[in-house]
């Protein structure tokens, strides 16, 4: 099914579901017993705060300025990130804690944690340059989590929780930015972007299979956003005073996402009992870029922090001026969406998940 048909079908089903049983959607019962998060800064809720090797941290203002306590938590935006928003919409919990956070309660462990690390990617080269926690090492953290979970609820119950948990994987942009587009360290090995895409997808395939071997069955894998519309990419390929999306990088994202959509059913078919969902982030984000007023956005080509052209992580700090109304900006810094954007994305993906569950129950 083409991307346009997929999004149309999803929105049609969403309207159908919302008109059927409002009480069901409003139930306080969680749709999954736990949520387990892997990936990069789009889903890292603060693991890098406790990872001394990396400089990619968000434990300072203005990050977190719109959280309830107005304090930075390690999330790379002004408030909640996607991890928290989707966990809230699925009635699991309001905030997903980072696994490396000291003194996590038993309840936090039982209902799920985040293993993601800002700066990570599927390609090990990515973490070499960022010193983020490699995806492979996130898997090792997950093994430690399983041991802790078993000590709390016992072996059988622990594996039941993991089997029924929603696993979210969000990574990929750092691989292309740091190894191909801006720092071409992989271009000699892969002269054509298609070859590097296949390499990254093979690493993704291996990672999903490893999670399956550890007991995960319900897995949502995120595609790439419109990479050429990230403010930092517009800056990196600066041509004139008019900032615009880089069409070639967007076409690359579309091609990667098409390959990913073809790959995931193959992985699912080979892993008995697995249920794997492609998370479409490209289309809703592109719609926000092209129709900003529909979402209340006034700025889509630069971030809210500093100039919005380059600042991220330590470059976006307490001395950086910020925009007056954070919710009017699609991006909070030069890479990361604002909480408002994550909210819209969360609404879209919540619909995807509910449609997915509905169709699975009937199959």
UniProtKB/Swiss-Prot annotation:
E.C. designation(s): 3.1.1.-
Sites carrying sugar chains: 25, 103, 325
Listed InterPro entries: GDSL, GDSL_lipolytic_enzyme, SGNH_hydro_sf, SGNH_plant_lipase-like
Keyword Ribonucleoprotein: no
Signal peptide: 1-22
GO BP terms: lipid catabolic process
Gene3D superfamilies for the chain: SGNH hydrolase
A GO cellular component annotation in the UniProt record: extracellular region
One GO molecular-function entry: hydrolase activity, acting on ester bonds
Name the record gives this protein: GDSL esterase/lipase At2g24560
Organism: Arabidopsis thaliana (Mouse-ear cress)
Lineage: Eukaryota, Viridiplantae, Streptophyta, Embryophyta, Tracheophyta
